[in-house]
Amino acid sequence: MKVTQEKLPASQIGLEIEITPEITQKTYEQVIKNLSRTVNIPGFRKGKVPRQVLLQRLGKTHIKAAALEELLQDGIEQAIKQESIAAIGQPRLRSSFDDLINSYEPGQPLTFTAAVDVEPEINLVQYTGLEAKAEEIKYDPARVDEVLEKERQELATLIPVEGRAAQIGDVAVVDFKGVIAKAEGDDENAEPEPIPGGDASDFQVELQEDKFIPGFVTGIVGMNPGDTKEVSAQFPDPYVNQELAGKPAIFTVTLKEIKEKELPELNDDFAQEVSDFDTLEALRASLAERYQKEAEDKTKNNQQEALLGELVKHIEVDLPETLIEKEVDAMLTQTAMRLSQQGLDVKKLFTQDIIPQLRERSRPEAVERLKRSLGLQEVAKRESIAVTPEEIQARVTELVQQYPDEDIDVERLHTIVENELLSEKIIDWLLANSTIELVPEGSLASQESEITAPETEAETIEVTAESTTGE
């Protein structure tokens, strides 16, 4: 079999394949023989159908098409093997199948073209001496006080209050019923449109403005138990229920009771109730250590992201469609798994109509991820960076001990750990051979917001789903 190769865009190899007359005839005859054994033709037993009857009944074009399918499949497979091509994904026929049917004659040579994806060639123009900026996240001691105060709020005892009006910080017990406020030009005599789910009895609302839709809490402040009044409010935009987003509303509110919070003292007893520590001092120290490490980890992550972003700029690679599609598949699978773990019906979110949009909008991120991965692999190859079996086993043992009750696929865990350790080593090497300038938190975010990449449809679905479950 004669095979001619050519290099095509997107890391493809084009193949011109010429199949010998002997093979085209032999395959055609074999197809006729196989069909005669399987086709039911009245008046003839299977395997005893005369050749001419079979040709008349099925038609020569049908038989040629069946033979051609075998010739193409076998021809491509043999060509890849003959030329020692490390193909990835499924080969693609470049010639028109209809044209091939018309030109194919058993006993004559058959020439057609196909293409296969191969691993891309990576040109890493620069990977040492990279320069980038990353935001430094500094530990804020005030976070410890904020966490402790939040715990106090959650452990607060509600004490009924009499003889005064409701004020910010109280907990109000109310009955309410809401309607959509009429806009200018609406029929004044029409019945107000009730808000779906916009009524409740004995509803406890904490009088903090961020605890309800804007205007609702402000309207309750100043009311006395027993008072009923109309409170104007407005649904935010965006809002979980898009039909209500941005619409003004009127709530008829009856204040039934006022309660105020009695907070526990911040002492050792409090520390023992909310944690495993015996003293408040020990709890504070633990929280401080946690948030210091969190700040350090975030700073390191920012450095890594800045480094990888800079590395990608110096990678020249023509990605094959097979790798991009595979990466998109992985991204959507990860998104589906996360949503499923949240208890959401993935089938309702990932409809047949939206999946093509998801795939298309996920491509830019898939390409970015592939470039990062291939870039790191190339650095490891050039600098002979590797992980040892001992390093892998140590990390695996550590993880298994952390989750003694989990049913762990140890072989798969080995693979995951090996990849993670290798990535860590490569990134550490790159950091040591690059300059990442740390800048104040927020200074880069403002610049990036001016050039914001559109979020993927999968991210949109996740945000919407999280908002729905959070209400």
UniProtKB/Swiss-Prot annotation:
<dbReference type="GO" id="GO:0015031">
    <property type="term" value="P:protein transport"/>
</dbReference>
<dbReference type="GO" id="GO:0043022">
    <property type="term" value="F:ribosome binding"/>
</dbReference>
<dbReference type="GO" id="GO:0003755">
    <property type="term" value="F:peptidyl-prolyl cis-trans isomerase activity"/>
</dbReference>
<keyword id="KW-0132">Cell division</keyword>
<dbReference type="GO" id="GO:0051301">
    <property type="term" value="P:cell division"/>
</dbReference>
<dbReference type="InterPro" id="IPR001179">
    <property type="entry name" value="PPIase_FKBP_dom"/>
</dbReference>
<dbReference type="InterPro" id="IPR046357">
    <property type="entry name" value="PPIase_dom_sf"/>
</dbReference>
<keyword id="KW-0413">Isomerase</keyword>
<dbReference type="InterPro" id="IPR036611">
    <property type="entry name" value="Trigger_fac_ribosome-bd_sf"/>
</dbReference>
<dbReference type="GO" id="GO:0061077">
    <property type="term" value="P:chaperone-mediated protein folding"/>
</dbReference>
<keyword id="KW-0697">Rotamase</keyword>
<keyword id="KW-0143">Chaperone</keyword>
<keyword id="KW-0131">Cell cycle</keyword>
<dbReference type="InterPro" id="IPR005215">
    <property type="entry name" value="Trig_fac"/>
</dbReference>
<dbReference type="InterPro" id="IPR008880">
    <property type="entry name" value="Trigger_fac_C"/>
</dbReference>
<dbReference type="Pfam" id="PF00254">
    <property type="entry name" value="FKBP_C"/>
</dbReference>
<dbReference type="Pfam" id="PF05698">
    <property type="entry name" value="Trigger_C"/>
</dbReference>
<protein>
    <recommendedName>
        <fullName>Trigger factor</fullName>
        <ecNumber>5.2.1.8</ecNumber>
    </recommendedName>
</protein>
<dbReference type="InterPro" id="IPR008881">
    <property type="entry name" value="Trigger_fac_ribosome-bd_bac"/>
</dbReference>
<keyword id="KW-0963">Cytoplasm</keyword>
<dbReference type="GO" id="GO:0043335">
    <property type="term" value="P:protein unfolding"/>
</dbReference>
<feature type="region of interest" description="Disordered">
    <location>
        <begin position="443"/>
        <end position="471"/>
    </location>
</feature>
<feature type="compositionally biased region" description="Low complexity">
    <location>
        <begin position="448"/>
        <end position="471"/>
    </location>
</feature>
<feature type="domain" description="PPIase FKBP-type">
    <location>
        <begin position="169"/>
        <end position="264"/>
    </location>
</feature>
<comment type="function">
    <text>Involved in protein export. Acts as a chaperone by maintaining the newly synthesized protein in an open conformation. Functions as a peptidyl-prolyl cis-trans isomerase.</text>
</comment>
<dbReference type="GO" id="GO:0051083">
    <property type="term" value="P:'de novo' cotranslational protein folding"/>
</dbReference>
<dbReference type="InterPro" id="IPR037041">
    <property type="entry name" value="Trigger_fac_C_sf"/>
</dbReference>
<dbReference type="GO" id="GO:0005737">
    <property type="term" value="C:cytoplasm"/>
</dbReference>
<dbReference type="GO" id="GO:0044183">
    <property type="term" value="F:protein folding chaperone"/>
</dbReference>
<comment type="similarity">
    <text>Belongs to the FKBP-type PPIase family. Tig subfamily.</text>
</comment>
<dbReference type="InterPro" id="IPR027304">
    <property type="entry name" value="Trigger_fact/SurA_dom_sf"/>
</dbReference>
<dbReference type="Pfam" id="PF05697">
    <property type="entry name" value="Trigger_N"/>
</dbReference>
